[in-house]
Swiss-Prot record:
MF GO annotations: structural constituent of ribosome
Gene3D superfamilies membership: Nucleic acid-binding proteins
Protein's UniProt name: Small ribosomal subunit protein eS28
Main location: cytoplasm
Entry similarity comment: Belongs to the eukaryotic ribosomal protein eS28 family.
PANTHER family for this protein: 40S RIBOSOMAL PROTEIN S28, SMALL RIBOSOMAL SUBUNIT PROTEIN ES28
Subcellular location: Cytoplasm, Cytosol; Cytoplasm; Rough endoplasmic reticulum
Native species: Bombyx mori (Silk moth)
Subunit structure: Component of the 40S small ribosomal subunit.
GO BP terms: cytoplasmic translation; maturation of SSU-rRNA; ribosomal small subunit assembly
Gene Ontology CC annotations of this record: cytoplasmic side of rough endoplasmic reticulum membrane; cytosolic small ribosomal subunit; ribosome
Keywords: Cytoplasm, Endoplasmic reticulum, Ribonucleoprotein, Ribosomal protein
Superkingdom: Eukaryota
Amino acid sequence: MDKPNVLARVVKVLGRTGSQGQCTQVKVEFIGETSRQIIRNVKGPVRDGDILTLLESEREARRLR
């Protein structure tokens, strides 16, 4: 349970999600790993190039339709 936090850089902002558009779906690339990319939902302001601290690095969000 003592997994370290993981840093990830926002590669692309995909769109808004949530019932009222309160979350932003982004594609992130892990820093320090071999170009692994996943999709996450982010709450709050975010843009390309931002660095996020992920508490869970294995969870991936479902794609927007």
